[in-house]
C-alpha cells in the first residue's frame, strides 16, 4: 500500500488539489512509516534487502524527484546499506546526481545534498583522510566549507581558517 501511494504520489500531487495539504500529508505519512521500517533493527534480512532495492530503485528512477521526498529514498537506502556492495551502488547513484552539469539552483541544491549523502556513506567505509579529501575537492559545498573551517580552527591552523573563509566569501 505504501509503495502504491508513493509511486502514484507525483501524479496525485500534480493532478490533484492539494491546497489543504492533505495529499502531501498522505505521502508524508507513508515516508514516516518507511523510515520506521528501515530503522527497525529486528527487520528480517530478506525484508531489509527487499526494501533497500525498492528505495534505491525509486531514487534511481526519479520517483518524486520534484519534491524533497526524493531524498528520503536514498536516506532510507543508506540506512539499510549494511555492506560495501550496497554502499557502492548508492555511491554510483549519488555520483550521477553530483556529476550533472549546470548552474541552476535545483542542480546545485541536488549536487550539494548528494555530496552530503556520499560523505555519509564514506564515513561508513572510507578513511578519515578520504573524507577530508572529498570535502576539500567539494569545498564549494557550504556544509563542507563549515566543517573544514571548524576542523582547521580546532587544530589551530588559523591561516587555513582565513583562506577558507576568504575563498568562501
Q: Where on the chain are the PLM-derived regions?
A:
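Eukaryote-biased, non-catalytic alpha-solenoid scaffold regions
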Residues: 1-169
Amino acid at each position: 500500500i505504501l509503495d502504491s501511494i508513493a509511486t502514484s504520489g507525483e501524479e496525485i500531487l500534480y493532478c490533484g488539489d492539494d491546497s489543504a495539504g492533505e495529499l502531501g500529508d498522505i505521502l508524508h505519512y507513508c515516508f514516516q512509516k518507511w523510515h520506521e521500517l528501515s530503522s527497525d533493527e529486528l527487520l528480517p534480512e530478506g525484508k531489509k534487502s527487499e526494501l533497500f532495492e525498492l528505495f534505491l530503485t525509486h531514487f534511481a528512477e526519479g520517483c518524486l524527484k520534484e519534491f524533497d521526498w526524493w531524498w528520503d529514498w536514498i536516506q532510507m537506502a543508506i540506512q539499510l546499506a549494511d555492506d560495501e556492495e550496497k554502499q557502492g551502488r548508492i555511491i554510483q547513484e549519488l555520483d550521477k546526481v553530483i556529476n550533472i552539469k549546470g548552474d541552476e539552483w535545483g542542480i546545485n541544491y541536488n549536487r550539494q545534498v548528494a555530496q552530503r549523502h556520499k560523505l555519509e556513506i564514506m564515513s561508513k567505509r572510507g578513511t578519515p583522510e578520504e573524507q577530508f579529501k572529498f570535502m576539500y575537492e567539494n569545498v564549494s559545498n557550504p556544509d563542507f566549507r563549515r566543517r573544514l573551517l571548524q576542523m582547521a580552527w580546532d587544530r589551530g591552523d588559523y591561516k587555513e581558517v582565513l583562506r577558507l573563509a576568504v575563498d568562501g566569501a
